[in-house]
Amino acid sequence: MKAITLSDFGGPEMMQYSDIETPTPGAGQILIRVHATSVNRPDVIQRQGNYPPPPGDSEVLGLEVAGVVESTGAGCERFRAGDRVVALVGGGGYAEYALALENHSMALAESISFEQAACICETYITAWLNLFLLGELQDKKTVLIHGGGGGVATSAIQLCRALTPATEILVTASTGKLERVSAQGAHHVIDYREQSFADEVRRITDKRGVDVILDHIGAKYLDSNMKSLALAGTLMLIGVMGGIKAELNLATMMVKRQRIIGSVLRSRPVAEKASIIAKFEAAVMPLIAAGTVTPLVDATFPLAEAAAAHTMMERGGHFGKIVLIMPNT
């Protein structure tokens, strides 16, 4: 089968369009003929040599796939050959065929295209898990979402509008993305390059602060994030693009009863991910099937041009997701 392999760690030029052996499903696994996968920030970090896959997972890049079941391993009961599915995988998505655990896979309605489906698992599950399950965001509260225009942020905005329609949504974004972020349903869009988002949050909320923050920047934003949190607010930390070390005023955090929760999806235990996916499928997949929530595809590339897709990701001008299309689909 065709797949993207790495000649070495480094830039996009290390990605090669190669022929490798098609995997065989083991117990509890399904083999998916992949129609589409998407590019995620962890793929870039793994390509650079800084984010190895969990033990036992494929070293091929790609954390989510959409396609059709080709075959099933022993013990699989839900899916059979020919079923449309979308799956969260620990690796192996940048290939014509990918293995997925059956309980990490979800049924894919005919109303959802494979290109859209390829955008679901990594970003929508991440947004839903951290905002609603861990962050405990409730209706009529306030939320600050960083990185407007990125896959997780656009997913988070849509989920807030669908699941907590009375929630006030604040989003940070670059100048060129402000109008498009607003069109997704954000009530307030803050130009982080021109404004202090902490000052803007205090102004917008009349100095109260927000109840939940979804942040992938980390150290660079920590002080401003804590200043932006309301009493008993929660900072959901899902990335460290802006650094891993920062000072924290613990006294203020204690007095204001604030929480910081660090969270990643990929390294969670298999059974825990299966539970999260089952809850997500019940809560969110019907909304996507109905068109209430719509994955945003900014650009598509043939699998052979994965290096160009990574270059686009690293330049940061995309809005929504970048999708790779498999050959002969």
Task: Please state what every model-predicted region is.
Residues R78, R84-G148:
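NAD(P)H dinucleotide-binding glycine-rich loop of Rossmann-like/cofactor-binding domains
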Residues A118-E194:
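Mid-domain Rossmann-like dinucleotide-binding core that forms the NAD(H)/NADP(H) cofactor-binding site
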Residues F197-K207:
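Short amphipathic alpha-helix with an adjacent loop that forms part of the alpha/beta core around
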Residues R84, T142, E168, T234, ...:
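Short glycine-centered segments of the SAM/dcSAM-binding site in methyltransferase folds
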Residues E21-S38, N50-G92:
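Glycine-rich beta-strand-centered segment in the early N-terminal region that forms part
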Residues A290-A299, A307-T329:
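C-terminal capping/lid region of NAD(P)-dependent oxidoreductase domains
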Residues G148, I217, V240:
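NAD(P)H cofactor-binding loop motif with strongest signal on the N-terminal glycine-rich segment
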Residues G176, S182, K220-T292, I325-T329:
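Glycine-rich phosphate-binding loop and adjacent beta-alpha segment
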